[in-house]
A protein has these predicted regions:
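BRCT (BRCA1 C-terminal) domain core and associated BRCT-interaction motifs
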Residues: 9, 67, 75-135
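Extracellularly exposed regions in secreted/surface proteins, prominently low-complexity, repeat-rich
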Residues: 137-157
Length: 157
């Protein structure tokens, strides 16, 4: 007589493995950080202390993100986080909401020659992605404030 629980156990195990695979793919392909809201604030100029930056290391040099984050912190920026990324980048890349976003422009002024890309994010954060090729490097004497022609900016809460 055949044992009835063997096929049932096999079906339960297959369902569990399928669910675990689906969940793993969903977690691996999801956003790095859940989008938090930003608050539109009226202002005529934006200073480094009002800008939150995430720094990612896409290169092979260990500690590159921390080094750049410390330079940004020294310039007055608020460092949201540092991390590594496996995404493929060439040179230093600044990622933010839009090209006319004052936060992005201020951060980009510290990295001459960096590539600036937009992803229409709604959280007010700016990402700096560094690789082994820092290009022209970090411009420590860049201006620490920028005029805001629109009169408002979306700052992270």
């Amino acid at each position: 007589m055949r044992k009835w629980y063997t096929p049932v156990l096999l079906v339960v195990l297959v369902v569990f493995v399928a669910f675990a695979g689906w969940w793993g793919v969903r977690m691996a392909t999801g956003p790095l950080d859940p989008a938090s809201a930003c608050e539109t604030t009226a202002l005529t100029s934006l200073s480094t202390g009002q800008v939150q930056v995430r720094v990612y290391n896409a290169g092979t040099v260990k500690g590159q993100a921390t080094t750049v984050a410390n330079q940004l912190k020294g310039a007055g920026f608020v460092i949201h986080s540092t991390s590594n990324t496996d995404d493929d980048y060439k040179g230093t890349t600044i990622v933010g909401a839009s090209g006319d976003d004052p936060q992005m422009q201020l951060v980009a002024s510290f990295f001459p020659g960096a590539t600036v890309t937009t992803d229409h994010r709604q959280n007010g954060l700016v990402d700096v992605v560094v690789t082994d090729d820092l290009g022209q490097g970090f411009k420590a004497d860049a201006a620490t404030s920028i005029d805001v022609p629109s009169g408002h900016a979306c700052l992270p809460v």
